[in-house]
């Protein structure tokens, strides 16, 4: 049995609101295996973004355990959590968050150089990913010169630049029109499968969810099979 790329065990997350406590996650259990693409669905306000933030080590759970590639994350220092994020995780958000003054290729080079990769191999990796996304002719364009779909495809390339083991995506096509969303989502699936990653992708779109390997629903603070 392969080591899960991501495992949550009885994860809870509560927030204080004055004298009241808001329980967003109430014992979430989830495993995502290497090479598996899992859709995370649920109504607005169910806590999908909170769950992804915890999976990405950007928030700490109130209780429970998060394991990334078999590594228990609860007692890690902030420096160690940062390294684990850098080396094991990739993130795609609803908005692309590209650096406007840099070209498409440079946006993909930056996280690699932060990780200690030299500029030449970083540029080669950027060119490889952009080619897979059908953007070779756009690699020298800045974000403002790209369409919304192209910007999001560059953001996906950036997320995969450091060859993560796990991709986390929060409504990655939510800002796009239906036709563009379809093209971007298919490109995302093709690239994730080609790279052999595990992925947890939050979406409100049931048609997109059904194209993934498995669907889980966040309901009343727990993760249940769809």
UniProtKB/Swiss-Prot annotation:
Matching CDD domains: ABC_MJ0796_LolCDE_FtsE
Instruction: Give the function comment from the record.
Output: Part of the ABC transporter complex LolCDE involved in the translocation of mature outer membrane-directed lipoproteins, from the inner membrane to the periplasmic chaperone, LolA. Responsible for the formation of the LolA-lipoprotein complex in an ATP-dependent manner.
Q: What is the uppermost EC class here?
A: translocase
Task: Identify the residues that the record assigns to the ABC transporter domain, covering every copy.
Answer: 6-226
Residues reported in the UniProt entry to bind ATP: 42-49
Q: What is this protein called?
A: Lipoprotein-releasing system ATP-binding protein LolD 1
* A GO molecular-function annotation: transmembrane transporter activity
């Amino acid at each position: 049995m392969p080591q899960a790329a991501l495992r949550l065990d009885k994860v809870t997350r509560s927030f204080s609101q004055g004298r009241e406590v808001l329980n967003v996650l109430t014992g979430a259990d989830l495993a995502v295996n290497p090479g598996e693409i899992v859709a995370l669905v649920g109504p607005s306000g169910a806590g999908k973004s909170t769950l992804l933030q915890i999976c990405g080590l950007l928030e700490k759970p109130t209780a429970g355990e998060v394991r990334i590639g078999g590594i228990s994350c609860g007692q890690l220092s902030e420096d160690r959590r940062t390294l684990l994020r850098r080396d094991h995780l990739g993130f795609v958000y609803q908005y692309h968050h590209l650096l406007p003054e840099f070209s498409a290729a440079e946006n993909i080079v930056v996280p690699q150089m932060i990780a200690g990769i030299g500029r030449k191999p970083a540029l080669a990796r950027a060119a490889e990913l952009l080619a897979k996304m059908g953007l070779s002719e756009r690699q020298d364009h800045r974000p403002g010169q790209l369409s919304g779909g192209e910007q999001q495809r560059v953001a996906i390339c950036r997320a995969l630049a450091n060859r993560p083991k796990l991709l986390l995506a929060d409504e990655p096509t939510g800002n796009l029109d239906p036709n563009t969303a379809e093209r971007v989502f298919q490109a995302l699936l093709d690239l994730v499968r080609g790279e052999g990653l595990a992925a947890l992708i939050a979406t409100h779109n049931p048609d997109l969810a059904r194209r993934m390997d498995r669907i889980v629903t966040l309901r009343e603070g727990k993760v249940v099979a769809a």
